[in-house]
Amino acid sequence: GDVKNTGVELALTWNDRIGKLNYNFGINGAYNKNKVGAIPNADGIIHGLTNMLYDNSEEFYRAENGHAIGYFWGYETAGLFQNTQEIADWKAAKNGILQTNVRPGDVRYVDQDHNGVIDENDKVDLGNGMPDFTFGFNLGFDYKGFDFSVNANGMAGNKIVQSYRNHGGNSKSNYTSAILARWTGEGTSNHIPRVTE
């Protein structure tokens, strides 16, 4: 297959001297995108691995014609059900439910094809881990053989996958402390669902 990378990069540096003090300053930034051109197989997809986030987890990344390389693939969510009335309203609007016994604190999954069923056809491109923007700066001083420098770098526009479950079902592993912000009752969270195991 092939991948097309496009973007722009810029770096500016200034070096100068004031008496015996040498100093320099630099900034840099880049905007980049990539897209998979053509994967030469029947479905145009290189599938990601399973069991990567936790035991029995499904494929969550892939490479596919027309998408960024290694994009995240899965169900789009629309928050958490806060109460039983929200569940009833969701079902009445003919939105699909993935869970067999949905309860408050469970995730709402978006029914992409509006057929009332959440299935493989509802999985979509959820973004990718490659940043849209990278940036940085550096600052340095040199005076009579002593020098000082600072460097900073950053990125923005990328997605991150976070699993709060332990890998391998290891009973000696714990959830991260982020699980403390999970749903524990109406209005407590709209991002981390209730704990079910």
What are these regions (language model features)?
Residues 1-4, 8, 15-127, 188-192, ...:
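Conserved small-residue
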Residues 77, 82-89, 128-161:
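Glycine-rich, aromatic-lined ligand/substrate-binding cores of catalytic
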Residues 24-28, 40-44, 148-166:
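Composition- and surface-driven signal marking solvent-exposed, interaction-prone regions
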Residues 95, 99-104, 155-197:
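Extracytoplasmic gating/loop element in the C-terminal half of outer-membrane beta-barrel translocons
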Residues 43-45, 141, 169-170:
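Juxtamembrane/interface motifs at transmembrane-helix termini
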Residues 8-16, 23-31, 135-141, 146-154:
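Membrane-embedded beta-strands that build the outer-membrane beta-barrel scaffold
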Residues 1, 19, 139, 163-164:
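A broad, low-amplitude sensor of folded, mature protein cores
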